[in-house]
Swiss-Prot record:
There appears to be no human ortholog of this protein. The active site is at H110 (charge relay system), D160 (charge relay system), S265 (charge relay system). Residues 1-33 form the signal peptide. This is Serine protease 40. Residues 70-314 form the Peptidase S1 domain. The gene is Prss40.
Amino acid sequence: MWGSRAQQSGPDRGRTCLLAVLLLSFSLFQLHAQDYKPSQTPPPTSDALLKPMGRVQKEICGKTKFQGKIYGGSIAKAERWPWQASLIFRGRHICGAVLIDKNWVASAAHCFKRSLKPSDYRILLGYNELSNPSNYSRQMTLSKVIVHEDYNKLHSQEKDIVLIQLHLPVRYSSHIFPVCVPDQTTKEPSDESCWISGWGMVTDDKFLQAPFPLLDSEVFLMNDQECEAFFQTPQISITEYDAIKDDMICAGDITNQKSTCRGDSGGPLVCLLDSYWYLVGLASWSGACLEPIHSPSIFTRVSHFSDWIEKKKADTPDVDPSLAPLEETAPSLIGWRNYSAGTTLEPRICTTLLSSQVLLLQSIWLRIL
């Protein structure tokens, strides 16, 4: 993440710079300052039947210690995002992930390009700073890795989702708690802000520094047509180009330079719906993670996969606890190394033209005000 933002990468596509600039200038995101208020009690941990939106939930989900709206961004407060997970590959953070119930975690399929062997990975839960585990922090071993069978088959980054079954169920606390999973009837907010979080890079050439704090950012959802303008080529009209598929959703805040970056892949895009936090997206790809930010980030639209998620969970046998490895000590990450190319996909960006046009138009706009 850069400052108060998280940023990710994107596929090898061009874009129409002038149109992107015009959209940036005349479609500035409305900002919402939000207050948070710590509650007196941690989120409930007992099982219950809820119906926050659409499908009945088997467990309580989407509640945090922070009730009401949230202000600002940058370094996230402990317990703010208790579903945030880190995907570790051979001892190194490579991607974000999200706890969706006591046995399952979701992430981006492209995070598993290195290996599909569960024993190569670990899931970290209950962390705020990756180098400073707390008494709530847990390192979980993986039983199964289920990549969507149609990932990348027809289009780049399409169906970029993976389900991860844990060997042992997690114990819920105010630091470890699942987010709600939307179904296809869940309506995404059109006029409210959402949030992204992760331990990714600050920029493409700047690593997050120790103690590796979790960063978060307020972002806004963008309709597909507006988003398409940032990723089309000059030779193809907006009606012919189709970078944003039905299983993708756009979000960002270009005005305030908030996006996703390397190492944020698979992390959450969450929105507050009827007082519950929902996993609207999983970080998938975006433009280059450099200043100034030229384009929104693209996320896997989780509601598109709600039936797939339920089916895979139902079809997968529970792990026999007697056969599971012993729970491991939560580690303290002490080094930060380059991410493999698998965690980021960067499109070609007409940086010079776009940067100069943005600065010019923003200057004119400020003078008019």
